[in-house]
């Protein structure tokens, strides 16, 4: 068993490396002095600064009587021959990360947990504390309690003003599922006001706007920037004539980065879709089925028009991660490969996992029970409403671009998907998506009417249905 040797006490027996932030810190689960613990090891150029900031945050939480895992010890160690600082915390028995709970619990259980998190954040604010890294993963839940972890993000204010507190609350709310929050937000604002001993919640209309701003900003930072550079989720390789972004989860697959080799594979693979603009093929790598979507350059004029613009492959890459970020089903992205001469782009490839699943029309043709059909209709309509609330438009909602996997819809063909920032254009694009989707069922009156009824029930805001002319004023 691996050990972390400490300068002033017995070593930590490491059972699991929980998290690694290169050149900054390592978080491990293990045993220290016969007790189950979590330890943070700070190393690198700013090790002491990060260590002291985390320690300060933990002390602020403890002083305010806010539940946080007890700090059992502080010590020093060595990483790569350099001094490292160690904080050792008691492991909380049966505690689960609240991000995991929100992803796996029933709707009522999710609301109950969200309300508890809002109360905890209200207690932070009441004590003049602000968690700047406000993610559900920075809280642990047991049957009875919520624990705040990660002291590094805790800041103390002599007097925390209302505006700052509401921005921080909005940051937390932006991390909840957009469809859940659409139904919960009024109740959660009431929970917060009661926890702060406020008679009413001030600026009630401001918070939803802030939530949307934070949500879009966080998603864009991840999908439009982070996954195009070296990070935990993605490995980057840059060659003289090629740019490669590789999903860390698929780093073991023997996929070539040379475009000539990829073209040879596409030529031998099973063709799923041919055409001048793009070619889609199914290939096998190390036993895994992989979809290769190659965006072709048709001629010199087409090359000149594309070389300064973002490739459609990179749009698919970003949107796949965007949907994953929002918890929307889509095949996992594997790699993005672009021909590049300096900053000039050429042919590009988007690789994703192959998912064996019927499209939505085939799925409905297989369904016999009306209850199953109605539940499937509701799932698809909820997907559409979620996209509307997120200001995301797909651009081509034909039935073949919606697969059904384990009775849940999955979106494919993401190169026309757009993240809108203006409500006017978001509404216009969503109405277009709705019209295209409903045209799929123009010859099936029963299914068309089932979707229409579900849209009327699920959509709290009927304006996109009216705009799409599938519902009258």
Model feature map: region roles:
Residues 109-120, 372-383:
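Conserved alphaE helix
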Residues 129-136, 392-399:
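Catalytic-loop of the protein kinase fold
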Residues 97-106, 360-369:
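AlphaC helix of the protein kinase catalytic domain
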Residues 1-16, 206-268:
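Juxta-kinase regulatory segment immediately upstream of eukaryotic protein kinase catalytic domains
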Residues 3-96, 116-127, 131, 252-359, ...:
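Conserved ATP-binding subdomain of kinase catalytic cores across diverse folds
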Residues 138-149, 401-412:
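Conserved protein kinase catalytic/activation segment
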Residues 136, 153, 356, 399, ...:
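Short, glycine/acidic-enriched loop or turn micro-motifs at the edges of active sites
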Residues 147-217, 410-473:
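C-lobe/activation-segment region of protein kinase-like
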